[in-house]
């Protein structure tokens, strides 16, 4: 991912110019994908959730996930810690996580994860992407705009489920609960293999929020869409070699569109 418009970002780009020609541009997205975004009466109430750190539009590669710091849900019964339900899965030597959750009552369920910091040597940053997804259950339609209280978070201004292809998604980028003027937001579609981007700029869409931190994007294809608000962290973190390095903080939300 990128941190647009910061001196630190510009400096890192200058240092990485030698690699840029050889390595295609690729945005990191923390995925948190449920089996469905809407649970209906008579439907399956047991939700499978997949947590993967990857490049969704390019269908990989998958990056190795450390054990998440926290994983939970904010629902009609309040907040619950779901970290004990996580199961680590490995493919091609890279770790991802899965979990199951039993929906028991009507309401909206905001699933969220704080992943372990990820070291990206190509950009010289530690990456922490606070990610959430909202599932509506049994037609209640209440609670979809609840905020978790993550350090960086997108508050939806449009109900983030029950969306048709072409609908406009709007949200507010917040840091520590306050809107972030002119925040950078990256958008990617979770590619099912049916689309080959004609050039790198088509892989990741880039939005600049307005002075109130509000952004909007019309989703042109059915499937899962990831919105990632990217900010520079206030404090450095140590990389695997113990050196303090900048931090990319992300607030992500996933929404799904369906064809009419």
Q: Where are the predicted features?
A:
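Bacterial N-terminal signal peptides
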Residues: 12-24
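Beta-strand-rich domain onsets/edges
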Residues: 28-48, 124-183, 189-193, 243-260
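Short tyrosine-centred short linear motifs in exposed loops/low-complexity segments
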Residues: 44, 95, 103-111, 164-166, ...
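Short amphipathic, basic-aromatic surface patches that mediate peripheral association
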Residues: 53-61
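Short acidic/polar inter-strand loop motif in beta-rich domains
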Residues: 58, 116-123, 233-239
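Short flexible loop/turn segments that cap and initiate beta-strands
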Residues: 61-70, 178-185
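Aromatic sugar-binding surface patches on proteins
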Residues: 88-98, 211-214
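Short, acidic Ser/Thr/Gly-rich low-complexity loop/linker segments typical of extracellular
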Residues: 194-212
